[in-house]
């Protein structure tokens, strides 16, 4: 009798695990499908260049590499900003001052920006002066371009924030995410975008 009970318990446990596995698989498929749909308009292939107006902060002025005081918006381009980080994968992070999820991501972006080049794009968050004020209040030290009308964001296919675009050292968009992204997932994408071109360069050319 005890053997029969043990057998039934084992069968029930196996069935339970199969059910859990099926549920997790369906959940993962749903997450991937939703993420794919949300990022369907984000750029692929070569990263589109864009004119940028950097918020007047010390970090932005330094990133632009142009003369100007910390109180003056600094014009530059995405290509010029990327050129300051040769051989490195970079991240472009679209956010908004009014976005609560973006605020949750700020500590991750702050940590990420200490190890990787990160460019923020403040979508529909006011002019350069207002964005700079928000940055100072929140301690956002990474360079940020202002996009008061959302024109730049729309040209990149960004319809909701936060969104993260990872560009490899050769200027190719490798990853694009929409919605909250954990820091480890951001770092993994940047590492992958940095490493894969290096590996490909070592392969024998046919």
Residue spans of the language-model regions?
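Aromatic-capped interface at the extracytoplasmic side
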Residues: 32-46
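Short pre-active-site segment immediately N-terminal to redox-active cysteine/selenocysteine motifs
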Residues: 88-90, 94-98, 160
């Amino acid at each position: 009798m005890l053997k029969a009970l043990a057998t039934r318990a084992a069968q029930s446990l196996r069935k339970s695990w199969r059910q859990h596995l099926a549920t997790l698989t369906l959940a993962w498929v749903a997450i991937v499908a939703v993420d794919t749909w949300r990022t369907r308009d984000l750029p692929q292939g070569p990263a589109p260049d864009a004119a940028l107006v950097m918020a007047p902060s010390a970090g932005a002025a330094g990133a632009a590499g142009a003369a100007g005081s910390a109180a003056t918006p600094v014009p530059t381009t995405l290509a010029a900003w990327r050129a300051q980080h040769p051989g490195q994968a970079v991240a472009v992070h679209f956010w908004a001052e009014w976005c609560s999820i973006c605020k949750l991501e700020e500590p991750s972006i702050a940590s990420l920006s200490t190890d990787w080049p990160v460019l923020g794009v403040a979508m529909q968050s006011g002019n350069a002066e207002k964005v700079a004020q928000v940055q100072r209040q929140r301690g956002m030290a990474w360079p940020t371009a202002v996009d008061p009308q959302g024109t730049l964001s729309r040209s990149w296919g960004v319809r909701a924030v936060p969104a993260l675009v990872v560009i490899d050292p050769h200027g190719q968009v490798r990853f694009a995410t929409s919605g909250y992204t954990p820091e480890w997932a951001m770092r993994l994408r940047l590492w992958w975008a940095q490493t894969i071109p290096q590996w490909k360069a070592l392969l024998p050319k046919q």
